[in-house]
Amino acid sequence: MKTKEEFHRIEISKFTEDLREAFGYKIQYRQDLVLVNIRGCNGAGKSTVPMQMLQTDPGAFMLTLDGKDKATVFPSYGFVAMGRYFSKTGGLDGFKNNEETLKVLKLLWELPFSIIMEGVISSTIFSTYCDLFKELEQRNNPKRAVGVLNLLPPFEVCLERIKKRTPEKFDSIKKDQIEGKWRTVNRNAQKFRDAGVTSWDEDNSVIDINDTVSWFFSSIKNNLQPEFTGLRLGVRFPTEEPVKALKKAEKGVKRGKKGRKTSPVAKTLDDNGDGAFLRSLKREIRPHWDPKYLNTPDDNVRLRRDPETGQTLWDMYFINLVERQNIWYRRVIQGKSKPWTDDPVMSTYHFTNVDRRLDRVTLHYIDKVLCNLEDSYESKKFLLLNTFIYRLFVRPETTDAMGYIFPETFEEDWERAKAALRARRESGEPVFTDAYFVNDLKSANPDRANSSNKTENAIHLIQFIIDHLDELAEFTFNPKNSMEEVIEKFTMIPAVGNFNAYEVALDLGIVKEMTGIDFVDWTPDHYANVGPGCKKGIEYVFEDLGNMSHLDIVFFITSVYKGELERLGLEYKYQEGCKELDLRALEGWCCEMSKYFNYYATERGYDWAKGKRPKKKMNLRTDDVSYLNPRISNLVK
């Protein structure tokens, strides 16, 4: 976070006048503006909300009155908080008297921001603020929903927070006075409701500090302003003039031909693109990454924005990534029943897990295929064969019926497997996955006249792999060959394309992690195959890729995702044994977000929509899901 001296400062009146001039003397106001008075005793967590906004918004700046800091603007969140937050006496507690408070509030009301008011002293005052809030509720131009958020965690929690914050002073603190404030806040909460002022209570004792902002937004939406989006305006540059940045972030929606919504201009935060913002992000370069993919965005790179909200699809990518993991966490780890999300798209349509290791099919591979590996070259060679077979069908019921093919009993096992395949087809049972399209495999059948039977084509393909297994194993296990080179080698097999070759390589890349047996020298974090879905997702997020290839962007996203989650106030709930996301996870999420943005953009009639809504509906089971618990790496057991 910047020091006090590093913040941009501007007089409130000058800032307002500059805004009027920038917007043609008519400031554009959002329809979901709010004023929230956060109340609570010491240790209740009032200042945590603006403090978290301050720490996660690099575009934050100060508004002054007579040369003194009087308000903190968080443009990325669309909020301004009365007061400053560089010292313990922040918020409304830094104002001299009520007259100064009302003077600053009057000036801030003209700005296109939602407003936060919070302070310890003001938390116990009722009549003055009740009259003020009822008067503010009647104001227009702009119209703001006004409400009182009463933070009432258990009093013991408040004391524990105070003790943690100032342990050296805790014994001398007058705890009875703090308890008196807690009771006053609780009592006044009902008095506000009786007077007709929107007032609601919240217990934030179990809210992680990194979830504070998103929790705050949800609280507003659920209790004060149903239309509140909590969307960021996307103004990020701490060095950019606030008025210039805000004007770009708040540009109105134009209508193109046929009534489709288009972005005001094909530009985003800066006339020179978003390269400066992207270059400002902290990158974590992993030592095993190939430097040829570690490109740096130039000034031609542009992020796409939602024309209605100004929010970047870049931010939406990370927000939805965390929400998809939250769905998994609530369903599998917490064992909750539906609904697992409030997101209307994710609650309706199917999106795969962020981490491939959590998918049912991959878990089955770990349990039923990897368990057969022994620490010998022959066993490793036949794991390669069985992995190809598994990813050819991607249907556990099929490979379970076939059984594992061992080197010691190869002839018997292979005959049994072929018989099982033919039996499933004859009985009408599905042989191949329905999760995605598997090509007809005709090119694997040398008898083209009899290549209409896809199951027989698959048998021919497996036989080809068996016939060339020594060659494939030698190339795969040669440490001189990279993951990318091995994938290219796999595509030389008839009917095996980049996608299937990549899937096999990914499975091989987790063998050592899951078994502890040395296998190959790569992991899913060494390379990513960028397929059509991933490309489409990237082209949604980026209006212009500039000098970056799609693969460059996958590496770039992976290198900055931790910092971006922190900037957005998001927490990713890693499964046990996992400390970070790999290239495959971020590449795969680009693909999933292409489905999300297809629906999102098409439903809104945006001219950059690239497809229709997802085909597959969410149909996740709510009964026993213990089999979906993550498998723990042998390397961390």
From Swiss-Prot:
SUPFAM superfamilies noted in UniProt: P-loop containing nucleoside triphosphate hydrolases
Keyword Acyltransferase found: no
Domain of life assignment: Viruses
Gene Ontology MF term list: catalytic activity
Keywords: Host-virus interaction, Inhibition of host innate immune response by virus, Multifunctional enzyme, Restriction-modification system evasion by virus, Viral immunoevasion
GO biological process, one term: symbiont-mediated evasion of host restriction-modification system
Reactions it catalyzes: 5-hydroxymethyl-dUMP in DNA + ATP = 5-phosphomethyl-dUMP in DNA + ADP + H(+)
InterPro entries linked to this entry: HMUDK/HMUD1, HMUDK_hel, P-loop_NTPase
Region (Disordered): 249-269
Family from the record: Belongs to the thymidylate kinase family. 5-hmdU DNA kinase subfamily.
Function: Phosphorylates 5-hydroxymethyluracil (5hmdU) into 5-phosphomethyl-2'-deoxyuridine (5- PmdU) on DNA as a step in the pathway leading to thymidine hypermodifications in the viral genome. The phosphate is added internally to the DNA polymer. As a final result of the pathway of hypermodification, alpha-glutamylthymidine (YdTMP) substitutes for about 20% of the thymidines in the viral DNA, the 80% left are dTMP. These modifications probably prevent degradation of viral genome by the host restriction-modification antiviral defense system.
Other noteworthy facts: Mutants hmdl and hmd2 are heat-sensitive mutants defective in thymidine hypermodifications with accumulation of 5- PPmdU and 5hmdU, respectively.
Swiss-Prot/TrEMBL domain comment: The N-terminus contains the 5-hmdU DNA kinase activity.
Protein name: 5-hmdU DNA kinase
Species in which this protein is naturally found: Bacillus phage SP10 (Bacillus phage SP-10)
